Amino acid sequence: MIRALEGNRAMVRSGLLGIIALAFLQGAALAQMHGQHASEAACEEPTLRCATKVTPAFGPDGTLWLAWMAGGQVSVASSPDAGRSFSAPTQVTTKRLNLDWGPDARPKIVVDRKGGIALAFSIFRDEAFNGQVLYTRSSDGGKSFAELRPITANNESQRFEALALDQDGTVFAAWLDKRNRVPAKEAGRRYEGAGLFFASSRDGSATYAEAKLARDNTCECCRLGLTFAAPGRPAVIFRNIFEGGVRDHAVMTFADVSTPGEIHRVSNDDWQINACPHHGPSLTVAPNGTYHVAWYTNGKARKGLFYAHSRDEGRTFSAPMALGQPGRNPTRPYVLASAVGTVMVWKEFDGEKTSVQMTISRDDGETWSPPKTISSTTDTSDHPLLVSNGQQVYLSWMTKADGFRLTAIEDQP
């Protein structure tokens, strides 16, 4: 067993040394984004076969739902047999759109107890990567979807949306939003990053309440980790901008769906960077209330993938535990707590193939099983995700060579 001991585009605003140091990061981030976009463009059909980003969710009856982006469109399909067969897909979009194809972008989907489906995704509105978050819903079991609507009337850039479903059917949305940059500039103030905004829906994602600011000056370009810590209390992990331009992760737990809480730093990684990592964190809350988080950093204090947990609602966290083999470029961590244990997965590359590594904790994050390869590919692939039907945890992974895979996480000794 392993004990938990360790752990939009780049924008350079000032300084010649900063420009030189960030040139490589900027090129790498844009190359990754354009490379993924080119891969998507090579397969023009809106089918699952052509998908580059696939997001899973289980319905209350055990039906698996997938939402994916392919051919400039967003589609959904369902499977009654854990991914062995799928229904004919339903296109959510009615025409080809300039979908957000950044490394951390994907459609988001949740399915409520009545079978209602809430969906959200973002599009690019211009060549400067300014985005807009759109949402829709289905009330007929995925046969059709309502007309797409913007999640906020504001026209400033919105990206990196996340959805979470409460026990009472409330849908909670959070995203990164740049509406405060223009007022700041007009007032002569420097504005960094973006604002963490949120809104909730009590009618199954038919309408959302007015958007509110939870936290300003957060990192503008990493996915959010969002869940409910308890009924009526969303919790979100995000890359914050701390003093000195340090972009480390923070957790916020809401008092209710309308009231943001204080932020608490997950770890002092000391990653001082004036650029966009495009490598977001993961958050899950166990049935007993323990917060489990996984993240990537390239800070002065530590570099790579790390895990930590909190037993006081995210106020303090355990010492970071390192994940993966540094020589194999571990990336894209995802963690999910279930009634039978907490599972973590991430990707590694050995020079020839990409593998998904998995580890399980049976004691609430104190110790972890030795990492095990549970899937691999020699071609491009999506981020590994975890999904549960309440009884079984699965790895959800889309690969170019083998298509969509749903792999049951088997019990470990």
Where do the model's predicted regions map?
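N-terminal secretory signal peptides that target proteins for export/translocation
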Residues: 1-12
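Exposed, low-complexity/repetitive linear segments and helix-based recognition motifs
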Residues: 3-4, 23, 41
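Residue-level detector of intrinsically disordered terminal segments
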Residues: 10, 29-32
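Bacterial N-terminal signal peptides
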Residues: 15-27
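Extracellular, repeat-based ectodomains that mediate carbohydrate processing or recognition
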Residues: 32-413
